[in-house]
Amino acid sequence: MVMFAEKCPCGMGGYGESFVRWLFYPKELYAYDDELGASPYESTTGRHPYGSWGNGAAMRVSAVGWFFDTLEETERVAAISAAITHNHPEGIKGAQATAAAIWMARNGKTKETIREYIEKTYGYDLHKTYEYWHPVYGWDDSCQGTVPQAITCFLGSSDFEDAIRKAVSLGGDSDTLACITGGIAEAYYKEIPRSIAEQVVKPFPKIFNKILDAVRKETVYGVTCKIADKRFG
């Protein structure tokens, strides 16, 4: 993450305040300590996790859902990916729930099976529908106030585009909602419309495209999903 930030110091849409401090001014952050222990990256970078329960941990975890053969390993690595910065229990839970939903979706689990597992394992209420949330939802950058709503947008969708439209129109932290919803929807529907894919990859820095190509080659992602963009064939 530090390498990406150094190459792209101001991400499209910007980075969160605490994350910017973690990246560029790590000494200003208080090292948050809990039962998980220290991040494995602290000793070499001088950066410490800062106890965040923010939805950034869930927003960035999607790739973890594609790398591993078992749900247990997926959840374990999702926790590690979150704890580098977001080592609050809610931050870790949000990342694990998102990665678990993606793993289940790519392995052909039904929406109801995904709903039941996430509710039972992570305690999120997924029975409130998109129609319930749309008129009442507002800004919330916590995992506990974002991940359930994002999963709900997926559960109530008919295809990938519909899932994204629901997430964006819900309001609040809509880019994060769409990241979480879209990661699950792509794994489930296994296709992204060409028009959407072209607009997404167009502004990417070259390093992002190199990483995407590597992920396609090294995981089942490349043979499972149809990315409807000319660059991907």
Label each region the model flagged.
Residues 1-233:
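Structured, active/binding-site neighborhoods that engage oxygen-rich ligands
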